[in-house]
From Swiss-Prot:
Gene Ontology terms: cellular component: cytosolic large ribosomal subunit
Disulphides: none
UniProt key word Ribosomal protein: yes
Name recorded for this polypeptide: Large ribosomal subunit protein uL29
Keyword Coiled coil recorded: no
Annotated PROSITE patterns: RIBOSOMAL_L29
Protein family according to the UniProt entry: Belongs to the universal ribosomal protein uL29 family.
NCBIfam families per UniProt: L29
Keyword annotations from UniProtKB, A to Z: Ribonucleoprotein, Ribosomal protein
CDD domains: Ribosomal_L29_HIP (cd00427)
GO BP terms in the entry: translation
GO terms of molecular function: structural constituent of ribosome
A Pfam family per the record: Ribosomal_L29
Length: 62
């Protein structure tokens, strides 16, 4: 997702989305380590989305 899409979301929605992405990242890392993951680029995309959400949450606090 784009940062502007995340900025339109409420804080509670952002936290929920971050939790979902963190769980998905965990599952993908597990698949990577067991050799079942085919699309390794998805790992980086999810990590970047989590970072975007964390940045937006930090901006809203300040």
């Amino acid at each position: 997702m784009k940062a502007n899409d995340f900025r339109k979301m409420a804080e509670a929605e952002l936290k929920q989305k971050r939790d979902e992405l963190t769980q998905e990242l965990f599952n993908l890392k597990f698949q990577l380590n067991t050799g079942r993951l085919e699309n390794t680029g998805k790992l980086g995309a999810i990590r970047k989305d989590i970072a975007r959400i964390n940045t937006i949450l930090t901006e809203s606090r300040g």
